[in-house]
């Protein structure tokens, strides 16, 4: 086949047309083997080579094949997924090029919304990382007072209150809610909700005390308080924002990138 001939790829439903010479820029890649018929995973369907991969990310890969440069939007964040695609196509230099971006520290964010109303306190915790919310869910226990059945032993004894442990509610993977303080039960009796946060064994009903313990827990997990504000002037909900800089868990080490491969931020390009 002539290097000037065109090839059409269907990658995840997106159509790309390029030259054979572009695909063969990296002879050791799976894309080059695809043209030689040496890789059976790529099938010819209706005159197009079908590839069951991410079409949106392939546009960056094809641009890299054409220019030996990686041009990414300023808001791009899917470095791990893009590197996974580069590994699939066995584009070693692109894999190496993405490594520094995977090694950059990324902040984990937490927001604590706190509302104190009369003798009740309400908490809602948002987290950018679901694992942080899972950690807090495993540590926080809400205890509700439940009256036990009255006992008879010649004389009547009033029902005793027992504590029923409950986990905080999880509206989504990224938040949890709970409350403490007085609690109106279904029989119009007033009980109390207590909150315990491991490893502290205390059962606290005062909202301010629970807030202090929750903040202390986040600080011990490496978070830093970055701001406080009032979310709503009507109900005076307080918001405490925390941040933790932590390297990503998935780290891949490869050879040094080739000197001819560079990343150019999109905003630095001159649009034609």
Swiss-Prot record:
MF terms in GO: identical protein binding
Organism domain of life: Eukaryota
Compartmental location: Endoplasmic reticulum
Biological process per Gene Ontology, one example term: negative regulation of delayed rectifier potassium channel activity
Sorted UniProt keywords: Endoplasmic reticulum
Pfam families, A to Z: BTB_2 (PF02214)
Tissue specificity as recorded in UniProt: Ubiquitous in normal tissues and expressed in some tumor tissues.
CC annotations in GO: endoplasmic reticulum
BTB domain span: 5-106
Keyword Endoplasmic reticulum: yes
UniProt keyword Oxidoreductase, yes or no: no
Main location: endoplasmic reticulum
Assembly, per entry: Can form homooligomers. Interacts with KCNA1 (via cytoplasmic N-terminal domain) and KCNA4.
Function: Inhibits potassium fluxes in cells. May regulate Kv1 family channel proteins by retaining a fraction of channels in endomembranes.
Listed name of the protein: Potassium channel regulatory protein
Organism name: Homo sapiens (Human)
Lineage, opening ranks: Eukaryota, Metazoa, Chordata, Craniata, Vertebrata
């Amino acid at each position: 086949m002539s290097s000037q001939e065109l090839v059409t790829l269907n990658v995840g439903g997106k159509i790309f047309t390029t030259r054979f010479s572009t695909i063969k820029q990296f002879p050791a890649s799976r894309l080059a083997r695809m043209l030689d018929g040496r890789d059976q995973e790529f099938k010819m369907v209706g005159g197009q080579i079908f590839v069951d991969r991410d079409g949106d990310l392939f546009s960056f890969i094809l641009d890299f094949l054409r220019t030996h440069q990686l041009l990414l939007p300023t808001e791009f964040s899917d470095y791990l997924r893009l590197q996974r695609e580069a590994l699939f196509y066995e584009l070693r230099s692109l894999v190496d090029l993405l490594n520094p971006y995977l090694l950059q520290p990324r902040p984990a964010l937490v927001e604590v919304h706190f509302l104190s109303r009369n003798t009740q306190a309400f908490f809602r915790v948002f987290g950018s990382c679901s694992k942080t919310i899972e950690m807090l869910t495993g540590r926080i226990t809400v205890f509700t007072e439940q009256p036990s059945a009255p006992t008879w032993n010649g004389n009547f004894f009033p029902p005793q209150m027992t504590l029923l442990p409950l986990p905080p509610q999880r509206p989504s993977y990224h938040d949890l809610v709970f409350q403490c303080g007085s609690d109106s039960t279904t029989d119009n009796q007033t009980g109390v909700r207590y909150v315990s946060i491991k490893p502290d064994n205390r059962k606290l009903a005062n909202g301010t005390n629970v807030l202090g313990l929750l903040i202390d827990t986040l600080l011990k997990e490496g978070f830093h308080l970055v701001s406080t504000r009032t979310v709503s002037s009507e109900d005076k909900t307080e918001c405490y924002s925390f941040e933790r800089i932590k390297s990503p868990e998935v780290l891949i080490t490869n050879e040094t990138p080739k000197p001819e491969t560079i990343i150019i931020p999109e905003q630095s390009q001159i649009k034609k």
